[in-house]
């Protein structure tokens, strides 16, 4: 999924018609020029995503780390997710935007290799953090009396994720090159000592095998797994809610269950929607790049890439800012006030501390008062 974050210029045979005073490449056809209004709009959009992604994830990390009572399994995973999203916002957005517009690399050979490597690592860490959160919620809702992950398990899982992410991203370090090959036949002085950065695998089959592996590893595989977990959680919560409705008055029906279900569905939908355009673009480009018109390549890529990067802003909202505690602490964060420990009035944003040790038998035997207490305790802790 991360395979074409940079344009593979070696696949294009283009003729340049450029001004010596312009740092931007233009194709021979004037229709290939991106209007300044489009460039300006894209720059504003990328800037907004960078600001929101950095500030949102940074605030989320600081708030969780500041509060000892919030250091449960899910929040540990959320910090890991936010950190990886923070890396994407810093290492992915600005470099990719500038390079795509300029069509030549100005950040040096080290960054040429490091940038796609860090991007691939960050994306892999992000998706597998979502997988671990789905696993934890699945265990605590579907099998509350069974194995429960603790903080130690969370740290082990995070370590495994980072090792897997680094290992799966190493080909970018090995095969990413910095070369002036596309500019060797350009006589204009403006393009002297200009370089491009792209991946050059031993063969097309090697490249397609690797990019297909990333497609499964970073998108389809995790997404299917997450969907299954949350679907089972949704069914269990709905069934539990229906069982409680049979013996309690309708006025006790909690809206929190609906909020949880909507949040769970939104998590999956947001990830799938944000990454789907770039996934399709990368897949088409990898297998038959000629389908994409040369003039439309950069614009299509930037739009797809920008949509994917919006996920770095969405995750803090779903996992943090919809929670009342984060909203309160966020005010302290932006007002530069000290955080106060509130053991009594804190709610836990995740399902990791839910007291759900209730079987069908106990539900059937419980009284209406007990049902109200059980259901409200569960929902208030989410």
Curated annotation (Swiss-Prot):
Protein's organism: Rattus norvegicus
Cytoplasmic side: 55-75, 137-153, 232-259, 320-382
The name this protein goes by in its record: Neuropeptide Y receptor type 1
Family according to the record: Belongs to the G-protein coupled receptor 1 family.
Organism taxonomic ancestry: Eukaryota, Metazoa, Chordata, Craniata, Vertebrata
A single MF term (Gene Ontology): pancreatic polypeptide receptor activity
Disulfide-bond pairs as recorded: 112-197
UniProt KW keywords: Cell membrane, Disulfide bond, G-protein coupled receptor, Glycoprotein, Lipoprotein, Membrane, Palmitate, Phosphoprotein, Receptor, Transducer, Transmembrane, Transmembrane helix
Topological relation to the membrane, as annotated: Multi-pass membrane protein
Function: Receptor for neuropeptide Y and peptide YY.
UniProt GO cellular component terms: axon; glutamatergic synapse; neuron projection; neuronal dense core vesicle; plasma membrane; presynaptic membrane; synaptic vesicle
Matching PANTHER family: NEUROPEPTIDE Y RECEPTOR, NEUROPEPTIDE Y RECEPTOR TYPE 1
Residues spanning the signal sequence: none
Lipid attachment residues per UniProt (S-palmitoyl cysteine): 337
BP GO annotations: feeding behavior; glucose metabolic process; locomotory behavior; negative regulation of cytosolic calcium ion concentration; negative regulation of hormone secretion; outflow tract morphogenesis; peristalsis; positive regulation of cholesterol biosynthetic process
Gene3D superfamilies: Rhodopsin 7-helix transmembrane proteins
